[in-house]
Every structure is written in C-alpha cells, then in structure tokens.
Amino acid sequence: MLDSVASTLQLSELLSLTKAEQSIRLAEINVELEMLSAQERVAWALQNLEGAHAVSSSFGIQAAVMLHLLSKQQADIPVILTDTGYLFPETYQFIDELTKSLNLNLKVYRANESANWQEARYGKLWEQGIEGIEKYNKLNKVEPMRRALNELNVKTWFSGLRREQSQSRAGLPILSIQNGVFKFLPVVDWSNKDVHYYLKEHGLSYHPLWEQGYLSVGDTHTTQKWEPGMSEEETRFFGLKRECGLHEEDNEQDGSGI
C-alpha cells in the first residue's frame, strides 16, 4: 500500500505551485494516506517527505501517543516544546517522566522575555480578552515555535491534532503545507477510544491531571477542568478560542511562520 502513495515529495517543488495546484496534489496523496494505519503513515512520511523532521508536543493529556509513535520509528527525532513558564507542575513532571521513559530528544524553546518580564510590561495578557490572548500566544507559542523550526531546519512538522477535538479541527487533512513546511497529522482521524487503546496496549499513561477531570491541558491560567455540559474546546482560553496559534496559517511564504 505504501508503494501506491507518491514517492519522495520535494517541498520546494510544491511551494512553486499555486495554492490550487498544491491542494490538488496534496488531495491525491491524502486519499491514499487515509487508507493507512497511523504507523504506516509515519513510516511513509519519514521516508518520503524531504528534509529534517520534528514533532511538536505540549505534553498534554494524550501526548504519550504521538511521542511513542514517532520515537519508535525515529529515535532521535527532535521533540519541540514551547515552554510558557505557566504550565502546571504536573505537566513539568510529565515532561521529565516521558523524556526519560521514551528517551526523547527534547528541544525546549521559550519566549525572549520571561513570564515575569511580560507581566511587568503588558500586564496579564490572558485577562485582556481575545486580543490579549492572541498577543500572549504570539509571544509564548508562535515566535518560539517559529524559531525552533528555523534553527532545527525543519521541513516536516509532525503534530498530534485530531479532528474530533474541536470544530476548528474537524476538516484537517493528514498532509498539508503550513507556512512553508509540511504538516503531518498521523492520528488526525483517531477517536478518544483509539487513543485509550493505544495507551493501554503500549503501557503508556495519560497526563496526571486526566484523573482529576481535565480533558485538555495548557497553561494554568487558561485551562479549566471539564464540567458536565462543556465541550473539550470550552475548557481552554475561557471558550473564546481553541487554537493557541501554532496550528493557524499566518500566510507567510518563507516557512518561518507558524
């Protein structure tokens, strides 16, 4: 089946096409990728998508799935974490545990200004409505990730986004181009049940806060515990938005934007 999917893709060649031409080319490949297992998709991507590869992780509730899936096929793949300085203590502990147990090649990136310095300059941005949250995300998520991809010369970026996580992710393809790099989502069609079975099969753990009722975990000040009647996306950013900015197109063409 893998042989039926297109051979090595040259990023520069695809970027020379119009958006419409890119969409047609990628759509043909995605039809084939949808028929493969997550493990087969990863194997195909590592073999056929040119350039350096990396996986981003927030070390959230189900993070162990992608980290295990990728590191088992490429042990030294860089794992990019953008550390805001406001993660839960349990998240930092989870990072240490997974880094040790999976022998991860962890690469930590942070904002140019420390958390305290940002508060001194801008106040608590997360309390300043959607504009404040977007500025906070740009400083602490988008710019550090942009820097990581540039410094590591990443051409293929793996992520664990899944369609059922939110309405904004419902139509995501497995393979796309985002701001000049390949974006590859091998578990995009997985359900929560699929995730659970994978974790159980491989002896992996959920984030520690899962047991306390958290469905999604980010920063302490913009993460809420799930309550009856809430959707998963309503547990983040006060329900104002789902994405932190990392997975949104910013229309840059040089591959630096996230």
UniProtKB/Swiss-Prot annotation:
Pathway: Sulfur metabolism; hydrogen sulfide biosynthesis; sulfite from sulfate: step 3/3
Enzyme class: oxidoreductase
Any GO BP annotation: sulfate assimilation, phosphoadenylyl sulfate reduction by phosphoadenylyl-sulfate reductase (thioredoxin)
GO molecular function, one term: phosphoadenylyl-sulfate reductase (thioredoxin) activity
Documented EC number(s): 1.8.4.8
Reaction catalysis annotation: [thioredoxin]-disulfide + sulfite + adenosine 3',5'-bisphosphate + 2 H(+) = [thioredoxin]-dithiol + 3'-phosphoadenylyl sulfate
The protein's name: Phosphoadenosine 5'-phosphosulfate reductase
